[in-house]
């Protein structure tokens, strides 16, 4: 009995050659619509789908393969006599191979001219139905959704006249992943359209971007996936101009770096980061000077660090960066001369280019944090803060220079691991206390780092001070200005201590924990 294949594809790459090889192997081919036209034009003889179903394609192509003559031919178990008898009684011929890929829903909704009606019309119904029927019956039916599998299938058919069970099972698994991801995209689109903020089912889909050597540590397996609907301002979308493949830790650090610099839009700024904590932030009227400040902030920790700049890297800045061992440099662009300088004898230096004009769109992305057996979902810590809404809670008002420095410090503290303390002036970070289990410990570490640069310095805390001992430590170091959220039941103790020492202190009313 001649074996039959059903071919209906949106992505026609390689399909003509595949079909010709099938014909050479003695197969009959059933086809539909544009696929049939393409195969017929290439001289591949095909059977029209309506010759199999006895019904014409109708309703603008919405109904063409949803028929017992198709799905009976796919689902009939070859080892069940009752199935085979039912097929015979109803003149249903068996189908042994299905090659289907789906309407381009993802590509359609990414179009700038997308309309709701167009999106709906590009939801495939018949394709997923055939794929799922064939995949369910993979004991007997081979199903192909990816042109990359054409060669494997043809090779096995040529060698043995059939594919192996292992191949059919693998391809079936691929189909179910594919249709699940396809439906997840549709669900995400409709969820967005109706404005459902907290759906009872969370369906998200990601595509494999990079198979990694290992994860956070060598004993951990890891891979990097990119959102199926990619965003431009993302490490997953960055253009790599030089260097080795990004590691797991590189990606996490780089992601933290590009989040930090989003808050420094107004002036040229450089952020240096290690282990997801900023170790140096500098801003100035030009990017070279901003680099100088960021480097000066911590010339020790910068070794092996991640650097992100929010302006084009020029030759002068590149010359200063080149002698230092850095893991990654990220910027919106590089001058031709700067790129030549940075890549000279630096084949491993990872240089990334990222479109900073797409930052705003990245801020609305949800954050996902895995826990054992669960997933936490939250919006990003992105809030429009206006310094005019802040409250000076002490007797002394900040000077103009202190106010500028406090605003800079408040932007910087947002990305320091809690309990987080940062000391800055108006253009660079000076000391950092991160990740301590008590706040006064972070205060002491930050002061120790900044001890030679405390004249005119200010201090920011990511959360309230639970006790006045923090204020006593800060005052003893000579720091005169503090910014913090407030909100402690002992706020008045801290205010009284600040007034006692002549400090100025601002409450922002916004906490910035980062775990």
UniProtKB/Swiss-Prot annotation:
Transmembrane segments: none
GO cellular component annotations of the record: cytosol
GO molecular function: IMP cyclohydrolase activity; phosphoribosylaminoimidazolecarboxamide formyltransferase activity
Entry keyword set: Hydrolase, Multifunctional enzyme, Purine biosynthesis, Transferase
Keyword match Hydrolase: yes
UniProt EC number: 2.1.2.3, 3.5.4.10
UniProt KW Translocase keyword: no
Xref: InterPro entries: AICAR_Tfase_dup_dom_sf, Cytidine_deaminase-like, MGS-like_dom, MGS-like_dom_sf, PurH-like
Biochemical pathway: Purine metabolism; IMP biosynthesis via de novo pathway; 5-formamido-1-(5-phospho-D-ribosyl)imidazole-4-carboxamide from 5-amino-1-(5-phospho-D-ribosyl)imidazole-4-carboxamide (10-formyl THF route): step 1/1; Purine metabolism; IMP biosynthesis via de novo pathway; IMP from 5-formamido-1-(5-phospho-D-ribosyl)imidazole-4-carboxamide: step 1/1
Domain MGS-like: 1-145
Pfam families tied to this protein: AICARFT_IMPCHas, MGS
Catalysed transformations (reactions): (6R)-10-formyltetrahydrofolate + 5-amino-1-(5-phospho-beta-D-ribosyl)imidazole-4-carboxamide = 5-formamido-1-(5-phospho-D-ribosyl)imidazole-4-carboxamide + (6S)-5,6,7,8-tetrahydrofolate; IMP + H2O = 5-formamido-1-(5-phospho-D-ribosyl)imidazole-4-carboxamide
Gene3D superfamilies the record matches: 3.40.140.20, Methylglyoxal synthase-like domain
Any GO BP: 'de novo' IMP biosynthetic process
Family: Belongs to the PurH family.
Domains: entry comment: The IMP cyclohydrolase activity resides in the N-terminal region.
Designated name of the protein: Bifunctional purine biosynthesis protein PurH
Species assigned in the record: Streptococcus pyogenes serotype M3 (strain ATCC BAA-595 / MGAS315)
Lineage: Bacteria, Bacillati, Bacillota, Bacilli, Lactobacillales
